A protein has these predicted regions:
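N-terminal glycine-rich anion-binding loops that anchor highly charged ligand groups
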Residues: 1-6, 29-45
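N-terminal small/glycine-rich loop or linker at the start of catalytic domains
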Residues: 1-16, 72, 128-134
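Hydrophobic alpha-helical segments
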Residues: 8, 25, 116-119
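Short N-terminal helix-initiation segments at or just after the protein's N-terminus
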Residues: 12-21, 43-46, 101
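Alpha-helical scaffold segments that flank or form the walls of functional sites
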Residues: 23-36, 65-68
Length: 154
């Protein structure tokens, strides 16, 4: 079993993905001391309308600094499947490969087939891949979603 912490990424919903530098340093120091394997630090995205802070876009300099602060941890970013397509993957992810180990994808079960194609593109670049399937209570309304799970360990 592996443990993933998503405190920063999830906290971004309350701070517009901006965090005080001292807070990040204290958080990173704490994470280095804990038996957590993966640290999900934010999103990586194409430009979107409206203001979203640097932890929504996770530019290279942010990831580089986080990796220095947490050298023993595997960094994770999340992609919002509704905004990201296969054609975005190389430009978004290749520059961050030295710093990020795992890419998670936030996905609505109704878009899961499209998310599988996105996951294959991400995996082809050498990243670990995981899904953050949203609206879990709706699975029973779409039994076809469960059928798509077969063979995903490949």
């Amino acid at each position: 079993m592996k443990i993933l912490d998503c405190t920063i990424r999830d906290g971004g919903y309350y701070t517009n993905w901006d965090f005080d530098k001292n807070l990040i340093e204290e958080y990173a120091s704490s994470m280095e001391e804990l038996p957590i394997d993966y640290i999900e630090v934010g999103y990586r995205s194409i430009p979107l309308e409206g203001y979203l802070g640097k932890y929504y876009y996770c530019p290279i300099f942010v990831l580089e600094e986080l990796k220095k602060l947490m050298p023993s941890k595997k960094l994770v970013i999340i992609l919002n499947e509704k905004d990201i397509r296969v054609e975005h993957v190389k430009n978004l992810l290749l520059p961050i490969k030295p710093f990020v180990s795992l890419i998670r994808m936030a996905v609505d079960p109704k878009n899961f087939e499209r998310a599988i194609d996105l996951a294959k593109a991400v995996k082809s670049l050498g990243f670990e891949v995981a899904f953050n399937v949203m609206y879990m209570s709706n699975w029973k309304n779409d039994p076809s979603f469960l059928n798509l799970l077969e063979g995903l360990d490949d």
